């Protein structure tokens, strides 16, 4: 028993010396590695924490494909959080100071999170492959429950490979500058060689081959769909176009994953090469630097994904810019001022329309009451016939750019309207001298209808107009049109079935005037019957915009156009 005990003690002492043995390298080599490890740890922890924060704070980002991205960020975060601090402290001490148990725990966590990242990228590739090449099957299988199960399987698969060295299949030992630990790929034994080969195949090479296969066929599927659309041209079915758009959307997510995979593979490739060199029996040609540098590069794979998302993923950038004030430079909103101005202008117009509509309803109610009172006082005989006033209106387009420019245009046109109104009043006075005065009840009804016409005209002008009244082309054309089938006499004594010559002349000349002036014209009919209804018509300009009829009297009583 004594020799065996001595042998065990000797092995324990050798193992302890193996953990505390320093490598004969300059101190600045340790400090240089410590600097890079600290940078990697800081960026890895901060960047992946921001990725998780962005995806958890924005509901639009919490979709099924992004579950794998969040899992990737969680794995990289834990990798940086558990590896960098211990690595940094050991580099400052120039040796491993946490003992054998600490070395095994450190190596176990590093293997667990590293393998999880690689297998998770494989799961992302398979998910994109199914969605793009087999969309119907993907719709049946994609669900929150199945995605959660897939992520759980990724972790279980990684856990199995990480636990193997702890149960006797290979082992965890210090590597490189003796400031970090990993599985024993240096010792040339059957156990170590078999574990190294199986690990490299089932964790690195086979997943990489499957990823390459998935992206190759994704690319071919997208190219085939694009060629089908180009070949069919306008005869392409709507379902084909929708499918092409859906595939292109999924391809954008696949491209992000592809960039992540490429960066990850490039980070771990040097470490895989060193491992295979040792497995082939040429570990003696590897220096401590050639073992440590690939390990640092592999751990740097945790910092790339946040930068990739910040560059490519637009929603991720916008979410961080909205949630984190110091990161607003990621998504500068150049159109914010324009959008605010547009909203304020629209709100202003809506408020004007609302206020004008309320005023019109009040005036309409008052006009109806006065019309009813006039009807009772004068009798129904006074309203046996309806007098209609015909007039054409010429409208000119203006530029609706700002409220200030619009008010300036209205103020310039007010002087011109005053002159036209004075001229019309003089003509009406001359005409009224040759005809009898209408009854008081008729005057009151006409006044109420005129007020209602003015209010309705203001309502039409309150909306964003493209045409504004600048002058009125004609006067009242008739005073004596009567209802069909009735032989009545109006106030001036002319027969009820007699038509005004000026009206006939006016309607004959309307097409010629439109063609000559190339100006849209419209007739405003203002009935003076007992219902006091006003019809507003709209004219369409050549470019499809709507022109609204505006009464000149309304412009005198109201400043809002």
UniProtKB/Swiss-Prot annotation:
Start-end of Low complexity biased regions: 371-385
Organism ancestry: Eukaryota, Metazoa, Chordata, Craniata, Vertebrata
SS bonds (residue pairs): 103-181
Record GO biological process: phototransduction; visual perception
Annotated region described as Disordered, given as residue ranges: 359-385, 404-448, 479-503, 539-561
Record has Transmembrane as a keyword: yes
Protein name: Melanopsin-A
UniProt entry tagged with the keyword Glycoprotein: yes
Cytoplasmic side, ranges: 56-68, 126-148, 223-255, 313-561
A single Gene Ontology CC term: plasma membrane
């Amino acid at each position: 028993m004594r020799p065996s005990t001595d042998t065990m003690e000797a092995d324990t002492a050798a193992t302890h010396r193996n953990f505390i043995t320093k490598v004969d390298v300059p101190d600045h080599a340790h400090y240089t590695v410590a600097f890079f490890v600290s940078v990697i740890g800081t960026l890895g922890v901060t960047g992946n924490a921001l990725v998780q924060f962005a995806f958890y704070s924005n509901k639009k980002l919490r979709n099924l494909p992004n579950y794998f991205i969040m899992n990737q960020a969680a794995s990289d975060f834990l990798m940086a959080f558990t590896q960098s601090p211990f690595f940094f402290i050991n580099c400052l001490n120039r040796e491993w100071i946490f003992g054998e148990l600490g070395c095994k725990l450190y190596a176990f966590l590093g293997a667990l999170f590293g393998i999880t990242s690689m297998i998770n990228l494989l799961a992302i590739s398979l998910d994109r492959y199914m969605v793009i090449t087999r969309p119907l099957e993907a719709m049946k299988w994609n669900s929150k429950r199945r995605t959660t199960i897939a992520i759980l399987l990724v972790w279980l698969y990684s856990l199995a490979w990480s636990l193997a060295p702890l149960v006797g299949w290979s082992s965890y030992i210090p590597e490189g500058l003796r400031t970090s630990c990993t599985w024993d790929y240096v010792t040339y034994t059957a156990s170590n060689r078999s574990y190294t080969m199986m690990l490299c195949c089932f964790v690195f090479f086979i997943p990489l081959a499957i990823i390459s296969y998935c992206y190759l066929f994704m690319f071919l599927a997208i190219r085939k769909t694009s060629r089908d659309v180009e070949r069919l041209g306008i005869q392409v079915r709507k379902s084909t176009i929708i499918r092409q758009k859906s595939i292109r959307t999924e391809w954008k997510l696949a491209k992000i994953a592809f960039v992540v995979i490429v960066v990850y593979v490039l980070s771990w490739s040097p470490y895989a090469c060193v491992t295979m060199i040792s497995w082939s029996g040429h570990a003696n040609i590897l220096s401590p630097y050639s073992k440590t540098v690939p390990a640092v590069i592999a751990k740097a794979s945790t910092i790339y994904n946040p930068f990739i998302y910040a560059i490519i993923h637009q929603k991720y950038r916008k979410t961080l810019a909205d949630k984190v004030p110091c990161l607003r430079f990621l998504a500068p909103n150049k159109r914010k001022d324009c959008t605010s101005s547009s909203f304020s202008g629209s709100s202003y117009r809506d408020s004007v329309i609302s206020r004008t509509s309320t005023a019109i309803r009040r005036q309409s109610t008052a006009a109806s009451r006065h019309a009813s009172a006039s009807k009772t006082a004068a009798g129904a005989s006074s309203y046996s016939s309806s007098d209609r006033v015909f007039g054409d209106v010429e409208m000119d387009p203006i530029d609706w750019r700002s409220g200030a420019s619009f008010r300036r245009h209205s103020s310039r046109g007010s002087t011109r309207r005053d002159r036209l109104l004075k001229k019309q009043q003089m003509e009406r006075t001359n005409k009224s001298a040759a005809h009898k005065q209408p009854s008081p009840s008729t005057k009151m009804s006409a006044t109420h209808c005129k007020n209602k016409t003015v209010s309705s005209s203001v309502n039409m002008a309150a909306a964003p107009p493209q045409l504004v009244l600048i002058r009125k082309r004609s006067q009242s054309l008739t005073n004596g049109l009567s209802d069909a089938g009735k032989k009545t006499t109006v106030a001036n004594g002319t027969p009820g079935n007699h038509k005004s010559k000026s009206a006939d002349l006016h309607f004959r000349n309307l097409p010629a005037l439109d063609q000559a002036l190339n100006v849209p014209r419209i007739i405003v009919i203002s009935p003076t019957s007992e219902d006091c209804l006003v019809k507003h018509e709209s004219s369409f300009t050549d470019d499809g915009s709507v022109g609204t009829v505006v009464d000149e009297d309304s412009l005198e009583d109201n400043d809002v156009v």
